[in-house]
Regions:
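Short basic/aromatic active-site micro-motif
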Residues: 220-264, 276
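Conserved tyrosine-mediated DNA breakage-rejoining catalytic core shared by Y-recombinases
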Residues: 148-185
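Basic, Lys/Arg- and aromatic-enriched nucleic-acid-binding interface segment
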Residues: 114-143, 261-267
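DNA breakage-rejoining catalytic core of tyrosine-based enzymes
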Residues: 100-119, 168-181
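N-terminal core-binding DNA-recognition domain of tyrosine recombinases/integrases
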Residues: 9-104
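Short functional hotspots where side chains directly engage DNA or cofactors
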Residues: 159-165, 248-286
Length: 286
């Protein structure tokens, strides 16, 4: 391991800001950045020696790679975190436009929805992972939420309640229980978890998350986040009566005034159920 990679890993371990998922993503991005800086010729760089020239070199490299606006923003966010931890918080402009990076577009070009197939579930040997995947499919949960799901806390009469510490951005939320299928799933979760999270007693969260990732790959599920997309599209059809644009339904511009009002109401509901605070993000799902 190169010096910079090692120092950034230590920096991340000493400053565990955010959820487990956020920490893991940050470490992965910073490890990539350290490798890119090495390739750019900064081979003896230290974590405390971060300078504007390094940021400029990285941004130039990323533009050559034609990465998405969202990826730009995630990488710059990791760089700002790094700069802040080494006492250089003001070194990187807060406005991404300083680097010629525009606003993220939330307009999806094609559906990323993924339906959970029986044959895929049959390849999952870990019953905890199997139930986490079913929760993701049935309630549109993120991976971390579905692993940390604790039935004694979460299951209410007509909804499930997600604790802030389980969620991205620390936003607690509830998702309605609408079907008998969902209730049967929650009973299965109660029986296995016995009040605790969907993590076996002999493992911690990180170990179970890694096991989840391995099992999902083995089952051939390339994009488990697509289960959230499928949930969003099902809910949209339930709430409006027609399919979402990305699922083959009518484009928003073709809707009548009455339909547009219903469309906006549905997007607000779905955004809240998915844990987002802006309805514009639903364009990625719908």
């Amino acid at each position: 391991m190169k010096d910079l990679n090692y120092q950034l890993m230590k920096l991340c371990k000493a400053n565990r800001d955010g959820s487990f998922s956020t920490q893991a993503t940050r470490l992965r991005i910073l490890d990539l950045i350290a490798n890119q800086l090495h390739e750019l010729g900064y081979q003896r760089m230290q974590a405390k020696s971060l300078k504007p020239k390094h940021i400029d070199a990285l941004v130039s490299l990323w533009k050559d790679h034609s990465i998405s606006v969202g990826t730009y923003k995630n990488r710059l966010s990791a760089l700002r975190w790094w700069a802040n931890k080494v006492g250089k918080a003001d070194m990187i402009p807060k406005d991404n436009s300083a680097y010629g990076i525009g606003k993220r577009s939330y307009i999806g070009e094609e559906s990323k929805a993924h339906m959970l197939e029986v044959k895929q579930l049959e390849k999952i040997s870990d019953p905890y992972v199997r139930l986490s995947l079913r929760l993701q499919s049935a309630f549109g949960l993120r991976r971390e939420e579905a692993i940390k799901f604790s039935p004694n806390y979460a299951i209410k009469d007509d909804h499930i309640k997600l604790k802030a510490s389980w969620t991205k951005g620390g936003r607690a939320r509830s998702v309605p229980i609408r079907t008998d299928e969902q209730r049967k799933l929650l009973e299965d979760v109660r029986k296995l978890a016995r009040g605790s999270a969907l993590i076996p007693p002999e493992r911690n969260y990180v170990e179970q998350r890694n096991r989840y990732d391995r099992q999902v790959r083995t089952a051939g599920i390339k994009n488990p986040h697509g289960l959230r997309h499928a949930y969003a599209q099902r809910r949209y059809e339930e709430l409006t009566g027609w399919k979402a644009p990305l699922a083959g339904g009518p484009a928003s511009k073709s809707l009548t005034i009455e339909q547009r009002a219903l469309d906006e109401k549905a997007r607000t509901v779905i955004s809240r159920e998915l844990g987002h605070d802006r309805t514009s993000i639903t364009r990625t799902y719908l």
